[in-house]
Design a protein with these regions (language model features):
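N-terminal glycine-rich flavin-associated loop
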Residues: 29-51, 79
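FAD-binding core of FAD-dependent oxidoreductases
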Residues: 31-41, 64-67, 100-106
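Flexible, small-/acidic-enriched active-site or ligand-binding loops
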Residues: 78, 82-83, 98-99, 127-163
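A short, Trp-centered hydrophobic/proline-enriched beta-strand micro-motif
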Residues: 62-74
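A short core secondary-structure module
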Residues: 93-133
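Alpha-helical interface subdomain recognition
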Residues: 1-28, 47-51, 59, 63-64, ...
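A structural signal for short hydrophobic beta-strand segments in well-ordered beta-sheet cores
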Residues: 85-87
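Solvent-exposed alpha-helices and their adjacent loops that cap or buttress functional pockets
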Residues: 60, 77-79, 100-104, 114-118, ...
């Protein structure tokens, strides 16, 4: 949806994408739609040269390529200092953790230390079927998070995006920032779905001869969900507006990310309190949101990470 027309995409706006992803979040619809169609596209637009864009983006738009970034490692963090995987003798050996949609991807955008300058970050475009790559699903209450291991994976200069002598960290980070409001929209959609489920259940579940929604304590939980939902929605809309209006949007994006991640998780907690036992049934659907909210809580930075970024931008 964000791929430019000259590369075979529809070149829609971020707001168009946000509307779509808010609806996908209501599902929540699984799959690499965000990882490949939003995040990877934005990273490629920032880091790849013209030849690489012309080769890769049309295949993402057509669905031939499913691409996902591999950034975090066992040291875990979303700042540059946490990237330790390094190109050595034109090969990679190491591990990337919490790679979203890593099992369904055909290619990965791997953030690594440059061989010539260890202070520099390079983005390497790697086919997952390359010799030396092993992928496995991470265990636990996670949605589509995987571990990717590299054992002497051969790296050539043409696999490195952009200028091989350029530090790509700032460009990578810009691609992430441009994608965050879309992720927030997905979380807003999920929070809205949890609210709708909770309100409907409070109307139809009877106890002591009346709907449980008449009890003040149940109303308190639903109001708390509403407060989180509204905070996430309006901070997300403001971030989108500022980003598309070419205003200074970094602080607003970090604020929306912190609020939306917290909102989705807290909305699910409140939803389970309203539903009680039935909410834990996989067939009911609430647990799908609960699992997704936990997965996305730390994806591209948890609320604590984004709050630190806000404080730094305010010179605290």
């Amino acid at each position: 949806i964000l791929v430019p027309e000259k590369y075979g995409g529809s070149e829609n706006s971020l707001t168009d994408a946000a509307v779509l992803y808010e609806e996908l979040g209501r599902g929540p619809v699984p799959g690499p739609f965000f990882s490949s169609g939003i995040l990877s596209v934005n990273i490629l637009l920032q880091t790849a040269n013209e030849k690489q864009k012309a080769e890769i983006l049309p295949k993402i738009a057509s669905g031939e390529y499913i691409v996902t970034p591999a950034i975090t490692e066992p040291s875990y963090g979303w700042d540059k200092k946490y990237i330790n995987l390094s190109i050595e003798n034109n090969s990679l050996t190491g591990t990337k953790l919490f790679v979203q949609d890593g099992l369904s991807a055909t290619h990965i955008l791997c953030a690594v230390r440059s061989e010539k300058n260890k202070d520099s970050i390079s983005i390497v475009f790697i086919d997952v079927n390359s010799e030396g790559i092993e992928r496995k699903q991470l265990e636990g209450f996670l949605s589509a998070s995987s571990e990717i291991s590299f054992e002497s994976v051969k790296i050539t200069d043409d696999m490195i995006l952009g200028d091989i002598n350029t530090d790509q960290w700032d460009s990578l980070y810009t691609g992430i920032l441009n994608s965050l409001p879309i992720l927030c929209s997905y979380q807003v959609g999920g929070s809205q779905a949890v609210f709708d489920l909770s309100v409907e259940y409070s109307r139809t579940r009877k106890q002591f001869g009346q709907s449980i929604g008449r009890f003040q304590r149940v109303q308190d939980h639903i109001i708390e969900i509403v407060n989180h939902l509204d905070a996430a929605r309006w901070t997300t809309y403001e971030a989108l507006w500022k980003l598309e209006s070419n205003m200074d949007s970094n602080t607003s994006i970090h604020l929306a990310s912190a609020v939306s991640s917290e909102a989705y998780l807290k909305a699910c907690d409140g939803g389970h309190t309203v539903h009680a036992g039935i909410g834990s049934l996989r067939e009911y659907g609430l647990t799908l949101h609960t699992q997704m909210s936990r997965t996305l809580y730390h994806f591209l930075g948890d609320p604590k990470f984004h709050k630190r970024k806000i404080a730094k931008s305010l010179n605290f």
